């Protein structure tokens, strides 16, 4: 598979781990899973691994920032060993990107940065694109895009351009911040059955 990817000149820029870091009783599983992801990422020449510090897209319950900081410092040692960077997604309580910045500042390791899911800070923390960029700045190494509207107080995911996220403003802010990384359409049909099939979207 690795040789096929190289022959086709295809790159896998980011692996998405499924573990959630906030659960203290999952500590050993998190260490094991991230280690396995880091080994695979090195084999694939994949620079990034997405990690979830909180579980849900929206804030739901509290998270122990101090515990997460210490855990990320441990995980950073693993990431550095395999020359990959862990990207904490802007979801859950970390939709508040000031809080995420404070966490990343405390970790203070170049092998831990941010994945900006454009949806969650805008939708759940009422942040403008400018605020998110000002908060995270060069911590942003990878971007997930999706679109939605609110119906009866609930998020309803839509095709890009059919929601009300300020996508053009977001892309403009990234450009002004000299972002030159990947922008990935995250199609959440797994959690929103009404969405069109990926074949239609792509």
List each model region and its residues.
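Histidine-acidic metal/acid-base catalytic patches
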Residues: 8, 45, 97-116, 121-202
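Active-site acidic/histidine proton-transfer and metal-coordination neighborhood
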Residues: 4-14, 21-114, 123
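Active-site/binding-pocket entry motifs
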Residues: 18-21, 149
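Active-site-proximal beta-strand/loop segments in catalytic clefts of secreted hydrolases
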Residues: 17, 90-91, 146, 186
